[in-house]
Amino acid sequence: MRKTIVEMLKNAGEDFISGESIAGKLGISRTAVWKHVQKLRENGYEILSRERRGYKLKDAPDLLLPSEIQIGLDTKIIGKEMDYQPSVDSTNRVAKALAYHGAAEGTIVVAEEQTGGKGRLDRNFFSPRGKGIWFSVILRPKILPKDAPKLTLMAAVAVAEAMNRFNIKPEIKWPNDIMFDGRKIVGILTEITGEIAKISYIVVGIGINVNISREEFPEELRDIAASLSEINGEELSRVEFFRAVLKELDNLYIELSEAGFDKILERWKKYNITLGKNVRVISASDVEKSFTGKAVDLNHDGALVVETEGKLRAVYAGDVSIR
């Protein structure tokens, strides 16, 4: 309902729109409209009000609010339901709890900051307030658990396609890091809940460094992390970029369900910087175990095929560094 109010205010531009008009559109009282406007103001919207004239939107906050993100989103699955958190330890944790209690497929959990964001191999993920897009999406795909890695690759392609829309060239390092000049911009963590032969739900967590300056990164990350604004030369609208990512996720998830993985795999290969390179692979199950070889292909399941000691070895999970 607040999304509709914001949309009406934005469509009115510099004109005021009466409380009566808003009430009629929504089928509620003018008092209820006033209460919604007050809540929007609490969320950071600057809304002017004038007796006998109504309301006018003067400024919208740079926050990842559903009332902002869902305007013009027009997705079929992803982002129809959104859970907004000003601050949370981990969006994946919240999303898993919501999924366990029956949240709809496509539900998004998004936060302004994460205080305990996690990456692969239980690493911390730097997620400062208002500087990036930290979110998780709940999926309930009708696939076997062995096919779950395809969703990680799909998510990487979705973010890469969104970057293309903003004229930023993406580079994907298997399985799910998006890089620029050897520095990480995007991380993806996929967590599966289910049985041996059936997936109950999958939570795909995505962290995107949007408007973080080099100086704002912790010193230990400055040489290995980057942000979209650093590449672009100016700050990006987090709302617009997030909306673009959700649209790409929606399109690719539907494509995966209806047409399979082949074309998504082709697009992943187009963006990849791993194949043909010498790599070091760290096992997801035992970080003390690693091996080196040459990344030669991705198989149909999304596993990285590495030539090592004269044999081909398929890697389904782990961490890869390019040598």
Report each predicted region and the residues it spans.
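A short, compositionally biased micro-patch
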Residues: 50, 128, 173, 298-299
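Long, positively charged amphipathic alpha-helical accessory segments at protein N-termini or as interdomain linkers
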Residues: 1-29, 38, 42, 143-170, ...
